[in-house]
Regions:
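Chitinase-like catalytic core of GlcNAc-active glycosidases
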Residues: 62-235
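Bacterial Sec-dependent N-terminal signal peptides
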Residues: 1-7, 15-58
Length: 235
């Protein structure tokens, strides 16, 4: 009897294994399912239209402007944190920190958020341009200050033209600068000359783009006295 039980158990195991094997044979690779979650706009178009109208009315009125800094990805967004459309509607300006590298989806979202009176600014960080030059110059001792001015001018022009190329609503100039107190005379003159060249190109751009927004972000006390009057050209 004991032996019969063993044989019966062995037969049962074989049958179960055979069923599992045959079911595995019929398995198919999983397929992704596109699930669409309707947006507020799709669920209630009229209510959304009323909301947009009231939002624009608020932003057209007198209020404290809200700026946010945004590290936009070089490729198309893969999650909500990389999307312009996910930023709060109360924001007025989004400053893109990677203005030279815009994906097609990010460009499309720049257009989409304008319906909420959210505008995008191309961020030009002068210190980054200086650092580019310093990295270039440290490997070549023969480069001169004239070469530095030429390089900085070319990079500045290349950054300014992005506003037209990508359809930004304006430019934010990020200029930290340095304290001029205690600077040696030759260093001071170089500092002033580079500053003057940079801002003169920005103001030339401004003359040709009166319909765009120009914002200065930095320390006013680090501007040379002869460059102070250019602040009137900013929004």
């Amino acid at each position: 009897m004991k032996r019969i039980v063993k044989n019966s158990l062995f037969t049962t195991i074989l049958m179960v294994w055979g069923m599992m094997y045959s079911s595995c044979e019929g398995w198919t690779d999983p397929e992704s399912i596109n699930i669409h979650y309707p947006t507020f706009e799709e669920q209630n178009p009229q209510l959304y239209a009323d909301y947009i109208r009231d939002l624009k009315r608020y932003k057209d009125g007198e209020h404290k402007l809200v700026f946010v800094s945004f590290d936009n990805p070089e490729t198309n967004p893969i999650n909500q944190t990389e999307r312009l459309t996910a930023i709060l509607d109360s924001v007025d300006f989004i400053c893109l920190n990677n203005p030279e590298k815009l994906s097609s989806e990010t460009q499309a979202e720049m257009v989409k958020i304008r319906e909420k009176n959210i505008r995008t600014l191309s961020c030009i960080n002068y210190e980054s341009l200086e650092q580019e030059w310093n990295n270039k110059a440290k490997d070549n001792s023969e480069l001169t200050e004239e070469d530095a001015q030429r390089y900085l001018n070319e990079r500045t022009d290349a950054m300014l033209v992005l506003c037209d190329n990508y359809g930004y609503d304006g430019i934010l100039i990020d200029y930290t600068g340095l304290s001029m107190v205690g600077m040696q005379e030759d260093v001071l003159q170089q500092y002033k000359a580079r500053q003057q060249n940079f801002f003169s190109r920005v103001l030339d751009w401004r003359i040709k783009h009166t319909d765009k927004t120009l914002v200065f972000y930095g320390y006013v006390q680090y501007l040379a006295p002869e460059n102070m009057d250019m602040l009137d050209k900013y929004n």
